[in-house]
């Protein structure tokens, strides 16, 4: 009968198994996009994934949108405005933007692509056409840095398009809304001091530049103007190719021209291009251009080694299998050989350096072991604890190895086999005993097989071996009975029986021997035939 300790341990394991089963049913699996889930959880302000899942379930089951407190916009104008923003982004970047989360304003949503480009859209407000805001002029330095090539291609379109482009670039450089001012003439020169100050500000601003960020504000709007010619095609540098100068970069002028096109929508809001400090995604470095001043870009070339190193971030690590080497122990008198450096170091530490031994606590035993796990297995032999029970006959055992060997009795499995005679058994002890028998009788194997050379202890074993292993060769040989000749018996004198009958036995080359028994009163029939 099992002890109370074993029953308590069994009940504890059963309760643990049931608890794991219940937890596995209600466990939340978020899929393989773990980084995106963690980023969304942090942006929404949750500390646990379960809270994020509860929030998403509430959002799904709720009748209205939590983020949109105001009335929903018209289905046509609101969605068309979102399509316009997405189209504006697609002219600069080929990646598809996705919803990142709520923005800073009430009801504002932020969309972001994999390259870090963001733009905000507020569905609660429908843009309406308004007057054109007049803003501060763009400095000559900024013009040269951002729109030099685009302006050269658009000079034929007239002064009106150029003034609109310069006002939008001014908003980009200042990053804040500026008060309304009147635009000066196009060819007006500025003071040298102002140019130097603005050059310094531009270098500070562009040195920390990161991918484009689009944000929309429904306060301003754009007038209906003729569509300018398309902007030059953005060239994506290939691997090992030097990125082009900023003159060939996609210009904000072309983006703003597409916003104000009458075909898409009466541009209800202005799209403000800002330089955000969002870090670039290393895997999408080929989709973004580095924004640098002309002087610094000419002096410093992109570092290809840094791009290769950072491109490996986030990829799954592939572990290489350790090489199999034969490493013998270098201590004198020890011939152990290991295939792993870790095993060799462990062997040296406990067998030679420390020579730590674990003694059995039983006073009558006195055995010691080099490893603690071996001592634990040995201590079970002294106790009456039998935690391993056979499922066929309910017999209990102290160790799992004994249970495995016992279970083979019920299954009939005999995995161990003698390599000499093919004897099979269930446990290693039986095989060792059987091999010892072969070692003792090795000198007595005097009868070899004439076909394969295998030796046996008895001639009967040779005959049994030939009939089992070489049945096709036996018919060509003489039968075993002919190998031993029958003894010849010659009796020249006749044996007289007590009754007077004579018994004569003759043997010749003929295998059939004749034996005659004659009595005195009965004549021999063979003598009668001869006469």
Swiss-Prot record:
Summary of the function given for this chain in its UniProt record: May act as an transcriptional repressor for PCK1 gene expression, in turn may participate in the hepatic gluconeogenesis regulation through the activated AMPK signaling pathway.
Subcellular compartments: Nucleus
GO biological process, one term: regulation of gluconeogenesis
Family: Belongs to the krueppel C2H2-type zinc-finger protein family.
Encoding gene per record: Znf692
Protein name: Zinc finger protein 692
Biased composition (Polar residues): 290-303, 483-499
MF GO annotations: DNA-binding transcription repressor activity, RNA polymerase II-specific; RNA polymerase II cis-regulatory region sequence-specific DNA binding; zinc ion binding
Zinc finger (C2H2-type): 327-352, 358-382, 388-410, 416-438, 447-470
Main location: nucleus
One GO term describing the cellular component: nucleolus
Keywords for the protein's UniProt record, in alphabetical order: DNA-binding, Metal-binding, Nucleus, Phosphoprotein, Repeat, Transcription, Transcription regulation, Zinc, Zinc-finger
Entry superkingdom: Eukaryota
KW Transcription regulation (keyword) present: yes
């Amino acid at each position: 009968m099992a002890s109370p300790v074993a029953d308590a341990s069994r009940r504890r394991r059963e309760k643990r198994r049931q608890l794991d089963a219940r937890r596995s049913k209600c466990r939340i699996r978020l899929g393989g996009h773990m980084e995106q889930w963690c980023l969304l959880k942090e942006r929404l302000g949750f500390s646990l994934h379960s809270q994020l899942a509860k929030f998403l379930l509430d959002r799904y089951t709720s009748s209205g949108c939590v983020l949109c407190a105001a009335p929903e916009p018209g289905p046509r104008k609101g969605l068309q405005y979102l399509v316009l923003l997405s189209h504006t982004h697609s002219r600069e970047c080929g990646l598809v933007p996705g919803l990142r989360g709520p923005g800073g304003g009430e009801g504002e949503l932020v969309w972001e692509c994999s390259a870090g480009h963001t733009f905000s859209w507020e569905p609660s407000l429908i843009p309406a056409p308004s007057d054109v805001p007049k803003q501060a002029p763009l400095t000559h330095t900024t013009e040269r840095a951002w729109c030099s090539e685009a302006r050269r291609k658009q000079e034929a379109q007239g002064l009106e398009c150029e003034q609109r482009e310069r006002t939008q670039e001014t908003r980009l450089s200042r990053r804040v809304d500026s008060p309304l001012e009147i635009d000066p003439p196009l060819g007006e020169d500025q003071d040298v001091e102002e140019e130097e100050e603005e050059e310094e500000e531009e270098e500070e601003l562009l040195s920390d530049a990161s991918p484009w960020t689009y944000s929309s504000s429904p306060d301003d709007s754009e007038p209906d103007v003729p569509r300018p010619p398309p902007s030059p095609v953005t060239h994506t540098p290939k691997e090992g190719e030097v990125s082009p100068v900023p003159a060939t970069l996609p210009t904000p002028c072309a983006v703003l021209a597409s916003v104000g096109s009458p075909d898409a929508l009466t541009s209800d809001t202005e799209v403000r291009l800002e330089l955000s400090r969002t870090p670039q995604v290393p895997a999408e470095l080929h989709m973004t251009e580095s924004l640098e001043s002309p002087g610094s870009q000419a002096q410093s070339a992109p570092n290809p080694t840094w791009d290769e190193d950072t491109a490996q971030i986030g990829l799954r690590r592939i572990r290489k299998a350790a090489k199999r080497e034969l490493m013998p122990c270098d201590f004198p008198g020890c011939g152990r050989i290991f295939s792993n450096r870790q095993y060799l170091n462990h062997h040296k530490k406990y067998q030679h350096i420390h020579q730590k031994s674990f003694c059995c606590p039983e006073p009558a035993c006195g055995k010691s072991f080099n490893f603690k796990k071996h001592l634990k297995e040995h201590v079970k032999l002294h106790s009456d604890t039998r935690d391993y029970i056979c499922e066929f006959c309910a017999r209990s055992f102290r160790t799992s190895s004994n249970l495995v060997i016992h279970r083979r009795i019920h299954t009939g499995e005999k995995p161990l086999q003698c390599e000499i005679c093919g004897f099979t058994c269930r446990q290693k002890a039986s095989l060792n005993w059987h091999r010892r028998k072969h070692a003792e009788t090795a000198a007595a194997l005097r009868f070899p097989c004439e076909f394969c050379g295998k030796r046996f202890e008895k001639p009967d074993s040779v005959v049994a071996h030939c009939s089992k292993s070489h049945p096709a060769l036996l018919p060509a040989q003489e039968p075993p009975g002919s190998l031993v000749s029958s003894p010849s018996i010659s009796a020249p004198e006749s044996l007289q029986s007590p009754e007077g009958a004579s018994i004569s036995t003759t043997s010749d080359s003929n295998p059939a021997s004749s034996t005659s028994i004659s009595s005195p009163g009965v004549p021999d029939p063979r003598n009668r035939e001869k006469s």
